[in-house]
């Protein structure tokens, strides 16, 4: 990294695909960061929460293609040659296990593009490979690079066969025409080609800096270690992605819909939180202002007990009085898939019925709701917990089928 360069990441790239296909290992090869950080994740050997890591794309003009691209400022052609920093990138490592699909969907709301990881040593597609690709389509992510991983553990013939399986799988989908890069993430082979594809196929989208600032919260923490003296305690931290506008250190902010408070008689109300930004960080980089692009950690004056253990995931951050009112009822213009995805056996998607329970993914919020009205093209859903959203925002719809929440369609909020 070049010493004083404090550029924030410009783009969020999701890393998606079936469980054990090497997503976390790929992120480590691209960034040097192992995103599986929680004790339960390490014990089970799988990503449970969204993992984040910031990486860099360096380019040496003196090298050939694609070896001119590297995640580090080092050069193959000449150790003394200076590479230039093209971009900083935030990677969102989404869990590939079927029981964690809701977590993947909340991460998809933050993504500008995606790396779809497919292991060459298993037939393609696997159930969550299918489900994740449909999720990208539902959320509207068109910039996709396919990473054919684990080519080092298969024969040349199997690698070619796997490549053909991938081509057949993506035909007619949003990923048709996407580049397919064979790699060994474990041995860091062909990582330069992945970076070259990222530069070409996942551009930094235009950002609107003049609108009121808005951020989706996808993680929240208490960063104080046990035993920290009271005078050294710092406020709670919320992490996520800024969608529009600019946040600055010292800004007053509102977090909505806030936290659930039980009132006398057992009624639950949501109370918005108001606080001040004390710090802004992108990975190890501390900045005075943060714009869209990358995953930012906002330090606040909130009591850390409020933010610990992802308590505020699904909330939205804005300036006081500038966020829309939280909604407990949504009218959705919906579109159903033909078939349920993520299951080994194919099943038709039945029409949505009045009275049934659905799981809705709205931004980074995951909430359950009961269908109170079901028309041919429009449904109305009464939510268990309120959400902050905008007209025409996309919503992913899931239904409980054989004990698991399965993607069945998507919609636009009216």
Curated annotation (Swiss-Prot):
Q: What are the recorded Gene Ontology BP terms?
A: formation of translation preinitiation complex
Q: Where is this region: G4?
A: 149-152
Which organism is the protein's source? Aeropyrum pernix (strain ATCC 700893 / DSM 11879 / JCM 9820 / NBRC 100138 / K1)
Q: What is the lineage of its organism?
A: Archaea, Thermoproteota, Thermoprotei, Desulfurococcales, Desulfurococcaceae
Annotated region described as G1, given as residue ranges: 17-24
Recorded hits in Pfam families, A to Z, give:
eIF2_C (PF09173), GTP_EFTU (PF00009)
Region span, G2: 45-49
Report residues binding Zn(2+): 60, 63, 75, 77
Q: What superkingdom heads the lineage?
A: Archaea
Could you list this entry's UniProt keywords, alphabetically sorted.
Answer: GTP-binding, Hydrolase, Initiation factor, Magnesium, Metal-binding, Nucleotide-binding, Protein biosynthesis, Zinc
Describe its partners and assembly state: Heterotrimer composed of an alpha, a beta and a gamma chain.
State the SUPFAM superfamilies in the record: EF-Tu/eEF-1alpha/eIF2-gamma C-terminal domain (SSF50465), P-loop containing nucleoside triphosphate hydrolases (SSF52540), Translation proteins (SSF50447)
The UniProt GO MF terms for this protein read:
GTP binding; GTPase activity; metal ion binding; translation elongation factor activity; translation initiation factor activity; tRNA binding
Q: tr-type G domain: from which residue to which, for each copy?
A: 8-206
- The segments labelled G3 in the record are 93-96
Q: What does this protein do?
A: eIF-2 functions in the early steps of protein synthesis by forming a ternary complex with GTP and initiator tRNA.
Catalytic activity, EC: 3.6.5.3
This protein's encoding gene: eif2g
The cysteines covalently paired via disulfide bonds are none
Report the family membership: Belongs to the TRAFAC class translation factor GTPase superfamily. Classic translation factor GTPase family. EIF2G subfamily.
Gene Ontology cellular component list: cytosol
Q: Where does GTP bind?
A: 20-25, 149-152, 184-186
**Where Mg(2+) 2 is bound, by residue?**
20, 45
Annotated residues that bind Mg(2+) 1 are located at 24, 47
Q: This chain belongs to which protein, by name?
A: Translation initiation factor 2 subunit gamma
């Amino acid at each position: 990294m070049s010493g004083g360069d404090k550029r924030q990441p410009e783009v969020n790239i999701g890393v998606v695909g079936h469980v054990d296909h090497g997503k976390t290992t790929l992120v480590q090869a691209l960034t040097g960061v192992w995103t599986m950080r929680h004790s339960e994740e390490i014990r089970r050997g799988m990503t449970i929460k969204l993992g984040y890591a910031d990486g860099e794309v360096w380019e040496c003009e003196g090298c050939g293609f694609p070896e001119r691209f590297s995640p580090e400022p080092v050069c193959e052609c000449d150790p003394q040659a200076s590479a230039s920093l093209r971009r900083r990138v935030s990677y969102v490592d989404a869990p590939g296990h079927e029981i964690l699909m809701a977590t993947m969907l909340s991460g998809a709301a933050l993504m500008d593009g995606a790396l779809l990881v497919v292991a060459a040593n298993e037939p393609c597609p696997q159930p969550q490979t299918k489900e994740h690709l449909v999720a990208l389509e539902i959320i509207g992510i068109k910039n996709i690079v396919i990473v054919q991983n684990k080519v080092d553990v298969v024969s040349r013939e199997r690698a070619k066969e796997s490549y053909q399986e991938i081509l057949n799988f993506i035909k007619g989908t949003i990923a048709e025409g996407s580049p397919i890069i064979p790699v060994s993430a474990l041995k860091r082979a062909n990582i330069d080609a992945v970076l070259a594809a990222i530069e070409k196929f996942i551009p930094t989208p235009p950002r609107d800096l003049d609108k009121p600032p808005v951020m989706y919260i996808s993680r929240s923490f208490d960063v104080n270690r046990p035993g920290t003296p009271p005078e050294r305690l710092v406020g709670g931290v919320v992490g996520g992605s800024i969608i529009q506008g600019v946040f600055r250190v010292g800004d007053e902010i509102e977090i909505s819909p806030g936290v659930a408070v039980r009132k006398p008689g057992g009624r639950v109300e949501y109370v918005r939180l108001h606080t001040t930004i004390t710090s802004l960080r992108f990975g190890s980089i501390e900045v005075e202002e943060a714009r869209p692009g990358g995953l930012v950690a906002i330090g606040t004056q909130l009591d850390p007990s409020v933010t610990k253990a992802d308590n505020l995931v699904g909330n939205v951050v804005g300036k006081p009085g500038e966020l829309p009112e939280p909604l407990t009822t949504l009218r959705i213009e919906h579109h159903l898939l033909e078939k349920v995805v993520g299951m080994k056996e194919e099943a038709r998607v039945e029409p949505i019925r009045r009275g049934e329970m659905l799981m809705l993914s709205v931004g980074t919020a995951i909430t359950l709701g009961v269908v109170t009205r079901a028309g041919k093209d429009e449904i109305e859903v009464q939510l268990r917990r309120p959400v902050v959203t905008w007209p025409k925002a996309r919503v992913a719809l899931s239904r409980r089928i054989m004990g698991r929440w399965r993607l069945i369609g998507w919609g636009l909020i009216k």
